[in-house]
Structures are given as structure tokens and as C-alpha cells.
């Protein structure tokens, strides 16, 4: 049975049984381009809050499923408040033999507020998420390339959130600590270590760590290609 054709118009949106058209986009988009800021810039806090609010405002458009929206919310919080992306990137691009103990210690001990603010990458990431929330029908007649690009963004974000949810499940139910996966990135270290150097507990984690390691490695390379910070 077809849904009744009802259209609701408000000051902010036009709503049909299938789609919602947002009239004003200003609170989801950046007001202007920002230059890369250093850790001592007095504007740093303002810019971080500006990006954070816009990512969070997109939460209702991520999915109709509460679990997915909650995972998105938790992931955004983690990215802004806890993730040491420079350490994660270093572990991906530097195999065991090329890793410097000094560099690892410096990156591991760098506080979030002391890191360079990657404004350009954050802006491109916001554009990526905006595309994943936007819908255009894929037809050859009208904007097929734009519609397909939005679909790719939506599928990538869906896979990312699915994997992040699996990490949360592993932390809750599989005896893997939060620090191992999201702070120390042990899964990017253990899988490349010789088995003789691992204890029994670490060996049990290898299959799951391999899955997370492959995904995060691919994600880092994707970010390098797109100039994003997914």
C-alpha cells in the first residue's frame, strides 16, 4: 500500500513521507574558509567549537536507526576530545623497523590542545559528511555524477560507523580495553609483531586486531587521498 501523499511545510523544512528538504543550510555549513591555526592561537577554541557543533547538528540525518546515530555521536566526540591522529598515522606509515622510540613517545605524550589544528582537513571532512546526508536520485538525466558521489560518501560513512560499533562491542564484551584500540592503537602494533614476542592473551586477540588494523590502515590511506580526517 502506498503511503499517503502528505506534505508538511514549516519555517525550516518541507517534509514528505520519503524526504525532508532543509530550507536553511547555514547552521550546517561553515561561514567562511579558515586558515590553519597553531596550538597557541586565541581563536583555536572558537574554531573547534564551530566545527564540533556542525558535525553534531548532522546527527539526525545520519540514519533513522538510533544505534547508528548514537555511534556517530560517540565517534565525533572521540575524534574531537581523545583521538591522537598523528600517532595513529605514524603507526600506519612506519612499520616496526622504521619506528623511532623517541617519535613514538613524543606523539603519545602530546596533549590534544597542543596539536596543530587541521582546519583544511576538518572542512573537507564536514563536506564529506554533508554529502553522505544529502540525497539526489541517480539518473543519467540529472546530476548523475553528483548523486553517485553522495552515495559513495554515504556508503563509506556507514561502513566506518559499523566498524566503530564493532570496536565498542569488543571493548564491552570481548575483553579488549578502550586504551588498546582508541588510545594506544595496539591493533596497529600487535599484528606486525613476531608471534614469539606475544603472550597467550595477545595471541588470542590477533584475529580481531587484524580486522581493525586492516580497516584503520585503509581509512588512513583514504584520508591521505581525500585530504580528510574521517
From Swiss-Prot:
Involved in sporulation and maintenance of the mitochondrial DNA. Is probably involved in a pathway contributing to genomic integrity. Induction: During sporulation. GO terms for biological process: ascospore formation; double-strand break repair; mitotic recombination. Transmembrane segments: none annotated. It comes from the Eukaryota. This is Increased recombination centers protein 19. The keyword Ligase does not apply. Disruption phenotype: Displays increased levels of spontaneous RAD52 foci in proliferating diploid cells. InterPro entries: Irc19 (IPR016613). Keywords: Sporulation. Belongs to the IRC19 family. The gene is IRC19.
Amino acid at each position: 500500500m502506498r503511503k499517503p501523499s502528505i506534505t508538511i511545510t514549516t519555517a525550516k523544512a518541507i517534509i514528505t513521507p520519503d524526504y525532508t528538504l532543509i530550507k536553511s543550510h547555514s547552521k550546517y555549513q561553515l561561514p567562511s574558509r579558515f586558515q590553519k591555526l597553531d596550538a597557541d592561537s586565541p581563536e583555536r577554541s572558537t574554531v573547534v567549537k564551530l566545527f564540533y557543533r556542525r558535525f553534531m547538528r548532522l546527527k539526525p540525518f545520519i540514519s533513522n536507526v538510533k544505534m547508528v546515530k548514537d555511534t556517530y555521536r560517540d565517534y565525533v566526540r572521540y575524534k574531537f576530545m581523545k583521538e591522537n591522529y598523528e600517532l595513529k598515522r605514524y603507526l600506519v606509515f612506519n612499520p616496526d623497523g622504521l619506528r623511532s622510540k623517541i617519535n613514538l613517545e613524543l606523539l603519545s605524550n602530546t596533549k590534544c590542545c597542543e596539536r596543530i589544528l587541521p582546519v583544511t582537513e576538518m572542512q573537507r571532512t564536514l563536506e564529506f559528511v554533508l554529502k553522505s546526508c544529502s540525497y539526489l536520485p541517480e539518473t543519467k538525466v540529472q546530476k548523475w555524477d553528483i548523486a553517485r558521489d553522495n552515495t559513495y560518501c554515504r556508503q563509506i560513512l556507514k561502513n566506518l560507523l559499523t566498524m566503530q560499533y564493532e570496536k565498542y562491542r569488543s571493548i564491552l564484551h570481548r575483553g579488549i580495553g578502550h586504551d588498546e584500540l582508541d588510545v594506544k592503537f595496539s591493533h596497529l602494533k600487535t599484528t606486525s609483531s613476531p608471534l614469539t614476542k606475544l603472550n597467550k592473551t595477545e595471541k588470542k586477540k590477533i584475529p580481531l586486531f587484524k580486522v581493525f588494523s586492516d580497516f584503520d590502515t585503509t581509512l588512513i590511506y583514504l584520508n591521505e587521498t581525500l585530504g580528510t580526517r574521517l
